[in-house]
Protein backbone atom coordinates (compact mmCIF):
# COMPACT_ATOMS: atom_id res chain seq x y z
CA UNK A 1 0.00 0.00 0.00
CA UNK A 2 3.00 2.31 0.44
CA UNK A 3 4.03 4.62 -2.39
CA UNK A 4 6.52 7.45 -2.83
CA UNK A 5 3.74 10.00 -2.36
CA UNK A 6 2.27 8.13 0.62
CA UNK A 7 5.06 6.38 2.55
CA UNK A 8 2.63 5.40 5.32
CA UNK A 9 0.25 3.65 2.95
CA UNK A 10 -2.75 5.14 4.74
CA UNK A 11 -3.96 8.02 2.55
CA UNK A 12 -5.28 7.38 -0.95
CA UNK A 13 -6.23 10.11 -3.40
CA UNK A 14 -9.66 9.32 -4.77
CA UNK A 15 -11.59 6.31 -5.98
CA UNK A 16 -11.79 4.49 -9.32
CA UNK A 17 -14.65 3.04 -11.34
CA UNK A 18 -17.31 3.22 -8.64
CA UNK A 19 -20.05 0.73 -9.44
CA UNK A 20 -22.94 -0.33 -7.19
CA UNK A 21 -23.61 0.66 -3.64
CA UNK A 22 -24.76 -0.21 -0.17
CA UNK A 23 -26.04 1.64 2.86
CA UNK A 24 -25.53 1.30 6.57
CA UNK A 25 -28.02 1.67 9.44
CA UNK A 26 -25.79 4.38 10.91
CA UNK A 27 -26.43 6.65 7.94
CA UNK A 28 -23.44 6.22 5.66
CA UNK A 29 -23.14 5.17 2.02
CA UNK A 30 -20.99 2.37 0.65
CA UNK A 31 -19.59 2.77 -2.85
CA UNK A 32 -17.82 -0.03 -4.65
CA UNK A 33 -14.63 0.17 -6.71
CA UNK A 34 -14.92 -2.24 -9.61
CA UNK A 35 -12.80 -2.33 -12.80
CA UNK A 36 -9.88 -0.36 -11.39
CA UNK A 37 -7.33 -2.40 -13.35
CA UNK A 38 -8.24 -0.61 -16.57
CA UNK A 39 -6.75 2.69 -15.42
CA UNK A 40 -3.18 1.41 -15.03
CA UNK A 41 -0.44 0.40 -17.43
CA UNK A 42 3.27 0.77 -17.96
CA UNK A 43 5.58 2.56 -20.37
CA UNK A 44 8.78 0.56 -19.91
CA UNK A 45 8.77 -2.36 -22.39
CA UNK A 46 11.06 -4.27 -20.03
CA UNK A 47 8.51 -4.19 -17.20
CA UNK A 48 7.00 -7.59 -16.36
CA UNK A 49 3.86 -7.98 -14.29
CA UNK A 50 3.93 -10.34 -11.33
CA UNK A 51 1.36 -13.01 -10.44
CA UNK A 52 -0.69 -10.66 -8.24
CA UNK A 53 -0.97 -8.12 -11.05
CA UNK A 54 -1.92 -10.81 -13.56
CA UNK A 55 -4.49 -12.29 -11.19
CA UNK A 56 -6.19 -8.89 -11.00
CA UNK A 57 -6.08 -8.32 -14.76
CA UNK A 58 -3.57 -5.49 -14.84
CA UNK A 59 -2.01 -5.08 -18.27
CA UNK A 60 0.37 -2.84 -20.22
CA UNK A 61 -2.35 -0.71 -21.82
CA UNK A 62 -5.27 -1.20 -19.43
CA UNK A 63 -8.58 -0.24 -21.01
CA UNK A 64 -6.89 2.19 -23.37
CA UNK A 65 -7.41 5.26 -21.19
CA UNK A 66 -3.64 5.98 -21.37
CA UNK A 67 -3.52 7.60 -17.95
CA UNK A 68 -0.15 5.95 -17.36
CA UNK A 69 1.30 7.90 -20.31
CA UNK A 70 0.62 11.29 -18.72
CA UNK A 71 0.56 10.64 -14.95
CA UNK A 72 3.31 8.49 -13.38
CA UNK A 73 0.95 7.62 -10.56
CA UNK A 74 -0.77 5.19 -12.94
CA UNK A 75 2.46 3.86 -14.46
CA UNK A 76 3.13 0.58 -12.71
CA UNK A 77 6.74 0.74 -13.77
CA UNK A 78 7.08 3.84 -11.58
CA UNK A 79 4.50 3.22 -8.84
CA UNK A 80 3.97 -0.51 -8.61
CA UNK A 81 1.91 -0.46 -5.41
CA UNK A 82 -0.61 2.12 -6.62
CA UNK A 83 -3.10 -0.46 -8.02
CA UNK A 84 -3.25 -2.12 -4.60
CA UNK A 85 -4.90 1.01 -3.25
CA UNK A 86 -8.00 0.43 -5.40
CA UNK A 87 -10.62 -2.30 -5.51
CA UNK A 88 -12.16 -1.58 -2.11
CA UNK A 89 -15.50 -0.78 -0.49
CA UNK A 90 -15.49 2.93 0.39
CA UNK A 91 -17.64 4.32 3.20
CA UNK A 92 -18.89 7.89 2.74
CA UNK A 93 -20.91 10.09 5.09
CA UNK A 94 -23.14 12.15 2.77
CA UNK A 95 -24.52 14.18 5.67
CA UNK A 96 -21.17 15.53 6.86
CA UNK A 97 -19.29 17.61 4.31
CA UNK A 98 -16.16 17.63 6.49
CA UNK A 99 -15.93 13.85 6.82
CA UNK A 100 -13.26 11.86 5.00
CA UNK A 101 -14.26 8.76 3.00
CA UNK A 102 -12.71 5.55 4.32
CA UNK A 103 -11.66 2.52 2.30
CA UNK A 104 -12.83 -0.44 4.38
CA UNK A 105 -9.97 -2.78 3.62
CA UNK A 106 -11.19 -5.53 5.97
CA UNK A 107 -13.88 -6.27 3.35
CA UNK A 108 -11.29 -7.40 0.79
CA UNK A 109 -9.91 -6.14 -2.49
CA UNK A 110 -11.55 -7.26 -5.71
CA UNK A 111 -13.96 -5.97 -8.36
CA UNK A 112 -16.83 -4.98 -6.10
CA UNK A 113 -20.31 -4.70 -7.57
CA UNK A 114 -22.43 -3.88 -4.54
CA UNK A 115 -22.41 -4.29 -0.77
CA UNK A 116 -25.53 -5.79 0.82
CA UNK A 117 -25.42 -4.98 4.53
CA UNK A 118 -27.68 -6.66 7.07
CA UNK A 119 -27.77 -6.96 10.84
CA UNK A 120 -27.65 -10.60 11.92
CA UNK A 121 -29.85 -11.87 14.78
CA UNK A 122 -26.79 -11.79 17.07
CA UNK A 123 -26.28 -8.09 16.30
CA UNK A 124 -23.23 -8.47 14.11
CA UNK A 125 -22.99 -6.60 10.83
CA UNK A 126 -22.84 -8.84 7.75
CA UNK A 127 -21.89 -7.53 4.30
CA UNK A 128 -22.45 -9.77 1.26
CA UNK A 129 -20.38 -9.03 -1.87
CA UNK A 130 -19.54 -10.44 -5.29
CA UNK A 131 -16.44 -10.03 -7.44
CA UNK A 132 -17.87 -9.04 -10.82
CA UNK A 133 -15.67 -10.94 -13.27
CA UNK A 134 -15.95 -14.38 -14.82
CA UNK A 135 -14.63 -17.20 -12.63
CA UNK A 136 -14.58 -15.07 -9.50
CA UNK A 137 -16.07 -15.48 -6.07
CA UNK A 138 -18.76 -14.54 -3.57
CA UNK A 139 -17.72 -13.07 -0.23
CA UNK A 140 -19.15 -11.99 3.08
CA UNK A 141 -17.76 -9.93 5.94
CA UNK A 142 -18.87 -10.39 9.55
CA UNK A 143 -18.03 -7.66 12.03
CA UNK A 144 -16.24 -8.41 15.28
CA UNK A 145 -18.45 -5.97 17.17
CA UNK A 146 -22.22 -5.74 17.39
CA UNK A 147 -24.59 -3.02 16.25
CA UNK A 148 -26.05 -0.77 18.95
CA UNK A 149 -29.60 -0.21 17.75
CA UNK A 150 -30.33 2.14 20.64
CA UNK A 151 -27.77 4.63 19.32
CA UNK A 152 -27.51 4.00 15.55
CA UNK A 153 -25.13 6.86 14.72
CA UNK A 154 -22.70 6.19 17.56
CA UNK A 155 -18.96 6.27 16.97
CA UNK A 156 -18.75 2.57 17.85
CA UNK A 157 -21.25 1.66 15.14
CA UNK A 158 -19.41 3.78 12.60
CA UNK A 159 -16.28 1.70 13.12
CA UNK A 160 -17.88 -1.73 12.77
CA UNK A 161 -16.57 -2.26 9.23
CA UNK A 162 -12.94 -1.90 10.29
CA UNK A 163 -12.68 -5.13 12.27
CA UNK A 164 -14.12 -8.54 11.50
CA UNK A 165 -13.72 -11.67 9.41
CA UNK A 166 -13.86 -11.95 5.63
CA UNK A 167 -15.20 -15.20 4.16
CA UNK A 168 -15.38 -16.69 0.67
CA UNK A 169 -18.06 -19.12 -0.53
CA UNK A 170 -17.60 -22.70 -1.64
CA UNK A 171 -20.57 -24.57 -3.11
CA UNK A 172 -20.80 -28.34 -3.37
CA UNK A 173 -23.24 -30.44 -5.37
CA UNK A 174 -25.85 -32.47 -3.53
CA UNK A 175 -26.17 -36.24 -3.44
CA UNK A 176 -28.56 -36.37 -6.40
CA UNK A 177 -27.06 -35.33 -9.71
CA UNK A 178 -29.03 -32.77 -11.68
CA UNK A 179 -31.46 -31.76 -8.93
CA UNK A 180 -29.92 -28.29 -8.68
CA UNK A 181 -29.58 -28.69 -4.92
CA UNK A 182 -26.37 -28.50 -2.94
CA UNK A 183 -24.60 -27.13 0.08
CA UNK A 184 -22.54 -24.06 0.78
CA UNK A 185 -19.66 -23.31 3.10
CA UNK A 186 -18.20 -19.98 4.17
CA UNK A 187 -14.42 -20.29 4.49
CA UNK A 188 -12.60 -17.64 6.54
CA UNK A 189 -9.89 -15.64 4.80
CA UNK A 190 -7.72 -15.33 7.89
CA UNK A 191 -3.95 -15.17 7.93
CA UNK A 192 -2.48 -18.25 9.57
CA UNK A 193 -5.48 -20.47 8.80
CA UNK A 194 -6.20 -22.93 5.98
CA UNK A 195 -2.81 -22.45 4.34
CA UNK A 196 -2.93 -18.65 4.26
CA UNK A 197 0.52 -18.39 5.77
CA UNK A 198 4.17 -17.91 4.94
CA UNK A 199 4.46 -21.39 3.45
CA UNK A 200 2.16 -20.20 0.64
CA UNK A 201 3.53 -16.69 0.35
CA UNK A 202 1.13 -14.78 2.61
CA UNK A 203 2.77 -12.42 5.08
CA UNK A 204 -0.06 -10.83 7.10
CA UNK A 205 -3.81 -10.25 7.23
CA UNK A 206 -3.22 -7.11 5.20
CA UNK A 207 -1.58 -9.24 2.52
CA UNK A 208 -4.56 -11.62 2.56
CA UNK A 209 -7.15 -8.88 1.94
CA UNK A 210 -5.03 -7.19 -0.75
CA UNK A 211 -4.68 -10.57 -2.45
CA UNK A 212 -8.23 -11.73 -1.71
CA UNK A 213 -8.57 -13.44 -5.10
CA UNK A 214 -5.38 -15.43 -4.61
CA UNK A 215 -6.31 -16.28 -1.03
CA UNK A 216 -9.66 -17.57 -2.28
CA UNK A 217 -7.89 -19.63 -4.95
CA UNK A 218 -5.87 -21.26 -2.20
CA UNK A 219 -9.03 -22.16 -0.26
CA UNK A 220 -10.78 -23.76 -3.22
CA UNK A 221 -13.65 -21.28 -3.47
CA UNK A 222 -16.28 -21.87 -6.15
CA UNK A 223 -15.80 -20.01 -9.42
CA UNK A 224 -18.94 -18.11 -10.40
CA UNK A 225 -20.30 -16.53 -13.57
CA UNK A 226 -19.75 -12.87 -12.77
CA UNK A 227 -21.50 -12.63 -9.39
CA UNK A 228 -22.97 -9.20 -9.79
CA UNK A 229 -25.79 -8.01 -7.56
CA UNK A 230 -26.33 -9.50 -4.10
CA UNK A 231 -29.54 -9.02 -2.11
CA UNK A 232 -30.64 -10.38 1.26
CA UNK A 233 -34.16 -11.19 2.41
CA UNK A 234 -34.82 -8.77 5.30
CA UNK A 235 -37.49 -11.07 6.76
CA UNK A 236 -35.47 -14.29 6.63
CA UNK A 237 -31.92 -14.03 8.04
CA UNK A 238 -29.40 -15.97 6.02
CA UNK A 239 -31.41 -16.04 2.79
CA UNK A 240 -29.35 -14.34 0.10
CA UNK A 241 -29.97 -13.93 -3.63
CA UNK A 242 -27.17 -13.46 -6.16
CA UNK A 243 -27.48 -12.53 -9.81
CA UNK A 244 -24.74 -13.84 -12.10
CA UNK A 245 -24.36 -12.07 -15.44
CA UNK A 246 -22.60 -14.47 -17.79
CA UNK A 247 -19.53 -16.59 -18.43
CA UNK A 248 -18.76 -17.40 -22.05
CA UNK A 249 -15.79 -19.50 -20.92
CA UNK A 250 -17.81 -21.96 -18.84
CA UNK A 251 -18.11 -25.31 -20.56
CA UNK A 252 -15.44 -24.57 -23.17
CA UNK A 253 -12.44 -26.84 -23.58
CA UNK A 254 -10.00 -27.74 -22.30
CA UNK A 255 -11.58 -27.30 -18.84
CA UNK A 256 -9.49 -25.57 -16.19
CA UNK A 257 -9.81 -23.91 -12.80
CA UNK A 258 -8.21 -21.02 -10.97
CA UNK A 259 -4.99 -22.58 -9.70
CA UNK A 260 -4.51 -22.84 -5.95
CA UNK A 261 -1.15 -21.08 -6.19
CA UNK A 262 -2.83 -17.89 -7.44
CA UNK A 263 -1.03 -17.79 -10.78
CA UNK A 264 -4.10 -17.91 -13.04
CA UNK A 265 -4.52 -14.82 -15.19
CA UNK A 266 -7.82 -13.11 -14.43
CA UNK A 267 -10.72 -14.47 -16.46
CA UNK A 268 -8.69 -17.12 -18.28
CA UNK A 269 -9.93 -20.36 -16.66
CA UNK A 270 -12.56 -22.56 -18.33
CA UNK A 271 -14.75 -24.01 -15.58
CA UNK A 272 -16.86 -27.05 -16.37
CA UNK A 273 -20.64 -27.13 -16.18
CA UNK A 274 -21.43 -28.60 -12.77
CA UNK A 275 -24.15 -29.15 -10.20
CA UNK A 276 -22.38 -26.87 -7.74
CA UNK A 277 -23.24 -23.92 -9.98
CA UNK A 278 -26.68 -24.68 -11.49
CA UNK A 279 -26.94 -21.30 -13.19
CA UNK A 280 -24.42 -22.67 -15.67
CA UNK A 281 -26.76 -25.35 -16.97
CA UNK A 282 -26.85 -25.07 -20.73
CA UNK A 283 -30.62 -25.58 -20.95
CA UNK A 284 -31.10 -22.40 -18.89
CA UNK A 285 -28.95 -20.28 -21.19
Mark where each language-model region is.
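Short loop/turn segments immediately following the C-termini of beta-strands
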Residues: 34, 130-132, 245
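Entry beta-strands of beta-propeller and related beta-repeat scaffolds
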Residues: 28-29, 123-127, 237-241
Amino acid sequence: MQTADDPTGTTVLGMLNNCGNGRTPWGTYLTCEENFNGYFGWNDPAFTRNTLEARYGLSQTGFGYRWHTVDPRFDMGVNRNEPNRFGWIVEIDPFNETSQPVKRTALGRFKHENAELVIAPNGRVVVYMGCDEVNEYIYKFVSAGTFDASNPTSAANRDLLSDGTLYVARFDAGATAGDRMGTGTWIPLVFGQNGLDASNGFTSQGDVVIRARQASDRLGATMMDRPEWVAANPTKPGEVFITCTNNSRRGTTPPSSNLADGTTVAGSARPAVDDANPVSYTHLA
